[in-house]
Swiss-Prot record:
Source organism per UniProt: Caenorhabditis elegans
Residues reported to bind GMP: 226-230, 353-354, 402-405, 409, 428-431, 504
Main localization category: nucleus
Pfam families on file: RtcB
Lineage, top ranks: Eukaryota, Metazoa, Ecdysozoa, Nematoda, Chromadorea
Annotated protein name in UniProt: RNA-splicing ligase RtcB homolog
Cofactors demanded by this protein: Mn(2+)
Length: 505
């Protein structure tokens, strides 16, 4: 017999002002406990979702996030805790905003496409400029239109980068080294990119022909949904040393934020792998609490093939953001009549928030090789970590947090506490509060546009009918999310950004 909401809550208790525990027994076969980070307002959303589920009200076909965190805690080989971040919301298998790490040395350990997501290496890139708001304001509409003209956006958009099938194979394996060779990126760009823009484990032969066909025309495209290019202004600086190290010197400075991923190619890689993993589960006797948690042993043929294909899709996403960066620099050059170099359009950083990585972490006092799944979660390594660029060794890895449309975004830095508690991971954005369907039912197109106009934000949209899905009301408050992570000590606020122009698919 299903438990009541009150009975469910008996398995959940508060550990600190920002951290809750999900005890073993909440769902069957939990190998570790669950943890999730929320403040008071985000806590209400989490428990309301669980209550609606107990009352028989659906949440878009997915289980509530609390239950998904617990189900992930039951996967074979998981270590530490199954962790939910403040922007968490229900997703396929894993919640978006769920982290889980699996011991590579344990032959039972698994890798799960649901722990990465369908948009492999969906991520964020931030470019700085030496322009200020007063320089851009007179040309803001012209710049917005130029960006819209230069960057292919929307469902089914085709890329501006000419590519042969042989080029695609190279970019899947070379990542940003391909864009550097072809002249689409600067040598400095890859130095400020997670994995330096290339996962070396990538194998293009593990990407299906169908996935390649989907990706071939989409290189250099933004796509639709919550993907965007934004011109932003530095609104507030919290950590002057960190900001200065990133080339952000004062309020009013103009930056550009890009949010996109691996397009149809990554989606197809995930779809293909789920079929293979279901076969592997039947063969190896792997039992999971939710069929959406399809997985395979990390060291099985299926597990290795998925990881190699996922790495190739991740490389495609870095190439995609690099090609869009090329388009952005061209749009700025056309608008302002200066070279991108003269405008100091350097990449501050590029982060992934949908990926699995092989990393070394301390577990029970000793180093272990782990497969860390980050779905809707951003790597946030601290100062002096060997995997972050030399330029950021003294401040920690920059972490880019995009807000919802028309709201602020943030730059954070990683912390030692985050490395200990969350495998060096923090939030990735605002996180949905309403389903896309409910957003379309309850929010009007006019109200969204009027709100942006009141904020003096220029906008260009390829798919106006989808704009209601991306309205700020559809998302959690990004400031709540970031402040919760800051209060919990898993990341530290450095800079707040506000948008002045938005390009959306």
């Amino acid at each position: 017999m299903p438990r009541t909401f009150e009975e469910e809550c008996d398995f959940i208790d508060r550990l600190t002002d920002t951290k809750f525990r999900i005890k073993k027994g909440f769902v069957p076969n939990m190998n570790v406990e669950g943890r999730f980070y929320v403040n008071n307002s985000l806590e209400q959303l989490m428990f309301d979702e669980l209550k609606f589920s107990c009352d028989g009200q659906g949440i878009g076909g997915f289980l509530p996030a609390v239950r998904q965190i617990a189900n992930v805690a039951s996967l074979p080989g998981i270590v530490g805790h199954s962790i939910g971040l403040p922007d968490i919301h229900s997703g396929y298998g894993f919640s978006i905003g769920n982290i889980a790490a699996f011991d590579v040395g344990n032959p039972e350990s698994v890798i799960s496409p649901g722990g990465v997501g369908f948009d492999i290496n969906c991520g964020v890139r931030l470019l700085r400029t030496n322009l200020f708001e007063e320089n851009v304001k007179p040309l803001k509409e012209q710049l917005t239109q130029s960006l819209f003209d230069h960057i292919p956006v929307g469902v089914g958009s085709r890329g501006a980068i000419p590519m042969l099938a042989s080029d695609l194979v190279e970019c899947l394996e070379m990542g940003m080294d391909w864009t550097l060779r072809e002249g689409y990126s600067w040598a400095e760009d890859k130095e400020h990119c997670e994995e330096y823009g290339r996962m070396l484990q990538a194998d293009a032969s593990k990407v299906s022909l169908r996935a390649k066909k989907r990706g071939l025309p989409q290189l250099g495209t933004l796509g639709a949904g919550n993907h965007y290019a934004e011109v932003q202004v530095v609104d507030e600086i919290y950590d002057k040393h960190a900001a200065s190290t990133m080339g952000i010197d004062e309020e009013g400075q103009v930056v550009v934020m890009l949010h996109c991923g691996s397009r149809g190619l990554g989606h197809q890689v995930a779809t293909d792998s789920l079929v293979e993993m279901e076969k592997a589960m039947a063969r190896d006797g792997i039992v999971v609490n939710d069929k959406q948690l399809a997985c395979a042993r990390i060291n099985s043929v299926e597990g290795k093939n998925y990881f190699s294909g996922m790495a190739a899709a991740a490389n495609f996403a870095w190439v995609n953001r690099s090609c869009i960066t090329f388009c952005v620099r061209n749009a700025f050059q056309k608008t302002f009549g200066m070279s991108a170099d003269d405008m100091d359009m350097q990449v501050i950083y590029d982060v992934s928030h949908n990926v699995a990585k092989m990393e070394e972490h301390m577990v029970d006092g000793r180093p272990r090789q782990l497969c860390v799944h980050r779905k809707g979660a951003t790597r946030a390594f601290p100062a002096h970590h060997p995997l972050i660029p030399v330029d950021y060794q003294l401040i920690g890895q920059p972490v880019l947090i995009g807000g919802s449309m028309g709201t602020c975004s943030y730059v954070l830095t990683g912390t030692e506490q985050g490395l200990v508690e969350t495998f060096g991971t923090t939030c990735h954005g605002a996180g949905r509060a309403l389903s896309r369907a409910k957003s379309r039912r309850t929010i009007t197109w006019d109200s969204v546009i009027d709100d942006l106009k009141k904020k003096e934000i220029s906008i260009r949209i390829a798919s106006p009918k989808l704009i209601m899905e991306e309205a700020p009301e559809s998302y959690k408050n990004v400031t709540d999310v970031v402040d919760t992570c800051d209060a919990a000590g898993i990341s530290k606020k450095a800079v707040k950004l506000r948008p002045i122009a938005v390009i959306k698919g």
